[in-house]
A protein has these predicted regions:
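A short, hydrophobic C-terminal helix/tail in secreted or cell-surface proteins
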Residues: 157-175
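Extracellular zinc-dependent metalloprotease catalytic-domain scaffold
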Residues: 1-28, 33-155
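Short, intrinsically disordered, low-complexity terminal/loop segments
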Residues: 178-179
Length: 179
């Protein structure tokens, strides 16, 4: 599938964003939208038959499998979550296209297991906050959209090679004794 996209920025804001150190975050944030975060979550909106429906506008509930699994592991107390909360406030351009945070960029009280940072600091939340990070939840959403990422979720533990080798030798020994 081919597509053409563009990004444009209000040049009047660039100097202030550079001064406060958030210009790079703004560019990364907008690039993520360009390649699908919050813009290609609904296959019915973009006319891609057979695609997974990741989000229904107005629901506030992102349900993509990998993004949700990442959210469950990444944030404290979210192990049994059935969706990732999506922003419904802020109007057009913010609602339905960003991870949820308190309207105006305020903290949610949902914090990362790894470092205690609040969900409102995620790069793909709807309000610009200093110290933004690219969350595993966002990487999972990219995977849900079909991109390959470096996201590593906790998998079901596999037996060690030595244990598998030992089991194989035991199986061969038992087979030889019967024959």
């Amino acid at each position: 599938m081919r597509s053409q996209v563009s990004m444009s920025f209000d040049s009047a804001d660039v100097a202030a964003l550079e001064t406060d150190g958030t210009w790079e975050a703004v560019i990364l944030h907008e690039m993520a939208h360009v390649i699908g975060i919050g813009t290609l979550w609904s296959s019915s909106d973009v006319g891609i038959p057979g695609s997974q429906e990741l989000y229904v506008d107005g629901s506030g509930q992102y349900t993509g499998a990998t993004g949700l699994a990442a959210y469950q592991q990444e944030f404290v107390g979210q192990e049994s979550a059935t969706f990732v909360p999506v922003e419904l406030g802020g109007g057009g351009g913010t609602a339905n296209g960003h991870w949820n945070e308190g309207d105006g960029g305020f903290a949610t009280g949902i914090t990362r297991v790894s470092d205690g940072q609040d969900m409102n600091l995620m790069l793909m939340s709807g309000w610009l906050n200093g110290g933004s990070y690219i969350s595993d939840t966002t990487l999972g959403s990219f995977e849900d959209l079909g991109y390959n990422t470096t996201l590593v979720l906790n998998a079901v533990p596999e037996p060690s090679s030595a244990l598998l080798l030992l089991a194989g030798f035991m199986g061969i020994s038992l087979h030889r004794r019967r024959a």
